From Swiss-Prot:
Coiled coil: none annotated. InterPro entries: bL21-like, bL21-like_sf, Ribosomal_bL21, Ribosomal_bL21_CS. Belongs to the bacterial ribosomal protein bL21 family. GO terms for cellular component: cytoplasm; ribonucleoprotein complex; ribosome. GO terms for molecular function: rRNA binding; structural constituent of ribosome. Keywords: Ribonucleoprotein, Ribosomal protein, RNA-binding, rRNA-binding. This is Large ribosomal subunit protein bL21. It comes from the Bacteria. Pfam families: Ribosomal_L21p.
């Protein structure tokens, strides 16, 4: 069984037991989180598509860890002007484990 959920402005296809890095949620490690915005649920040939969400469907997950992604380097450069600006960014994430999909 799989589902498509929305969190942090992004869509993720998830299955039970899968580990996933999503945008940061303010939750402690070990806490449970429920995703109610389920766009699609599939089980073999049986597929339920929401309009826009599937009624009564939810995905339950457990917070595994909080962390930061690898650094993304930004360079702004002006040719022939001896000007270069360097910057870096590390985005926070929450790693979750999908524990259940309920339709």
């Amino acid at each position: 069984m799989y589902a498509v959920i929305v969190t942090g402005g992004k869509q993720y296809k998830v299955t039970e037991g899968e580990f996933l890095k999503i945008e940061k949620l303010e939750l402690a490690t070990g806490e449970a989180v429920t995703f109610d915005r389920v766009l699609l649920i599939g089980n073999g040939d049986d597929v339920k598509i929401g309009a826009p969400v599937v009624d009564g469907a939810k995905v339950v997950a457990e917070v595994v860890s909080q962390g930061r992604h690898d650094k993304v380097r930004i360079i702004k450069f002006r040719r022939r002007k001896h000007h270069m600006k360097r910057q870096g960014h590390r985005q926070w994430f929450t790693e979750i484990k999908i524990t259940g999909i309920q339709a």
